[in-house]
Amino acid sequence: MRARWGRRGARRGGPGLPGTHLALLAASLLSSSVAIYVCWKQLPPLPWASPSPPRPVNVLLWWEPFRGRHNPRRPPPDCQRRFNISGCVLHTDRAAYEEAQAVLFHHRDLVKGPPDWPPPWGVQMPPVEEREGLVMDDEGQEAEAETSAALGPRPAGQRWVWMNFESPSHSPGLQGLAGNIFNWTLSYRADSDIFVPYGYLYPRTHPSEQPPGLVPPLARKQGLVAWVVSNWDERQARVRYYRQLSQYVTVDVFGKGGPGQPLPDAELVHTVARYKFYLAFENSQHLDYITEKLWRNAFLAGAVPVVLGPNRTNYERFVPSNAFIHVDDFPSASSLAAHLQFLDRNPTVYRGYFRWRRSHAVHVTSFWDEPWCLACQAVQKAGNQRKSVPNLAGWFQQ
């Protein structure tokens, strides 16, 4: 499959054509121009070429992800200002359900109790008299459930969007979701209806041979390997591999649990920037599951990522092959350690892992504002096209 990060154009130049070939070249160019013109005339107009603004779209976020028990609601983002997406009217108030063209459902909140889906597919909250002693997630949960129970049938044309950024290994309750409830999927999977990766590379506007920050100053890199891990589990492949690797090379561990040193999130990038390598080890291995561990923790910090996740081919759909080191490239943890030590002694070879920065820069997705706005944009582009997801679990767990 074609890489999604793109490639630079071929370099121009070369010897001139002999005179005898000029006529043939002119004829070829003329026929090519006609073909291109015909193809271009058959293309639909580009979104930004339309003089009319996109139609306003109302998008309701049914649960605010990871809001917490006592945290106040965050105001919806300004999609125009943040992401240059106009025509979006975003809501967290369920009173807007009837007018919403799309409703976003975050999977983790979807499957944990108490259930309060909108009708008619959702299992509603029990009556008030049956809810004594029920533990609410926050003070507003009960009021929201009562609002849900008062809602009418699903409005015609309304799209339900299943949103999830966890891997199948950490997405319980998938089998309990009936088919054809949702119209669209929104996730890190490239085959989602709304593809929202944790990050991506984009071409620099003005590529140069030495853009600022191309190669972080090696003098600042006082450590060799760093790893930030939030949930320590000895059963995970990433912990088992760390146990092997740390026998041959020093790995400084940060985060909660295990041997890690506490590290505030605000200090993560600054801390990792002092290391040459970063273990971008995912908590599970699944198709396209490449998280902020690569995009923010490694790339933004200016460390070379050592990845453990999907296979190398999957990574190369999104980043150049020389931008990372994959554990699968080595027969053992000891051979990987030897390679890292070799790169530590050879700065010229090490700098080769930063060559891609000459042409591309890193974008890290802004959760949860960016997916919300992208869902709005998807509704605008889809028009009246209809679809549903017949087997959500079967698709996501493949």
Curated annotation (Swiss-Prot):
Sequence intervals crossing the membrane: 16-40
Membrane topology qualifier: Single-pass type II membrane protein
Positions glycosylated per UniProt: N84, N183, N311
Assigned GO CC terms: Golgi cisterna membrane; trans-Golgi network
One Pfam family it belongs to: Glyco_tran_10_N
Top-level taxon: Eukaryota
UniProt feature coiled coil, ranges: none
Enzyme Commission number(s): 2.4.1.152
Catalytic activity entry: a beta-D-galactosyl-(1->4)-N-acetyl-beta-D-glucosaminyl derivative + GDP-beta-L-fucose = a beta-D-galactosyl-(1->4)-[alpha-L-fucosyl-(1->3)]-N-acetyl-beta-D-glucosaminyl derivative + GDP + H(+); an N-acetyl-alpha-neuraminyl-(2->3)-beta-D-galactosyl-(1->4)-N-acetyl-beta-D-glucosaminyl derivative + GDP-beta-L-fucose = an alpha-Neu5Ac-(2->3)-beta-D-Gal-(1->4)-[alpha-L-Fuc-(1->3)]-beta-D-GlcNAc derivative + GDP + H(+); an alpha-Neu5Ac-(2->3)-beta-D-Gal-(1->4)-beta-D-GlcNAc-(1->3)-beta-D-Gal-(1->4)-beta-D-GlcNAc derivative + GDP-beta-L-fucose = an alpha-Neu5Ac-(2->3)-beta-D-Gal-(1->4)-beta-D-GlcNAc-(1->3)-beta-D-Gal-(1->4)-[alpha-L-Fuc-(1->3)]-beta-D-GlcNAc derivative + GDP + H(+); an alpha-Neu5Ac-(2->3)-beta-D-Gal-(1->4)-beta-D-GlcNAc6S derivative + GDP-beta-L-fucose = an alpha-Neu5Ac-(2->3)-beta-D-Gal-(1->4)-[alpha-L-Fuc-(1->3)]-beta-D-GlcNAc6S derivative + GDP + H(+)
Keyword Manganese included in the entry's annotation: no
Record's signal peptide: none
Entry keyword annotation includes Nucleus: no
Chief place where the protein resides: Golgi
Localization of this protein: Golgi apparatus, Golgi stack membrane
Group of enzyme by EC: transferase
Pathway(s) where this gene product acts: Protein modification; protein glycosylation
Keywords: Glycoprotein, Glycosyltransferase, Golgi apparatus, Inflammatory response, Membrane, Signal-anchor, Transferase, Transmembrane, Transmembrane helix
Membrane-side (Cytoplasmic) residue stretches: 1-15
Membrane side Lumenal: residue ranges: 41-398
A GO BP annotation: glycosphingolipid biosynthetic process
Family affiliation: Belongs to the glycosyltransferase 10 family.
Functional summary from the UniProt entry: Catalyzes alpha(1->3) linkage of fucosyl moiety transferred from GDP-beta-L-fucose to N-acetyl glucosamine (GlcNAc) within type 2 lactosamine (LacNAc, Gal-beta(1->4)GlcNAc) glycan attached to N- or O-linked glycoproteins. Robustly fucosylates nonsialylated distal LacNAc unit of the polylactosamine chain to form Lewis X antigen (CD15), a glycan determinant known to mediate important cellular functions in development and immunity.
Protein name: Alpha-(1,3)-fucosyltransferase 4
Organism in which the protein naturally occurs: Bos taurus (Bovine)
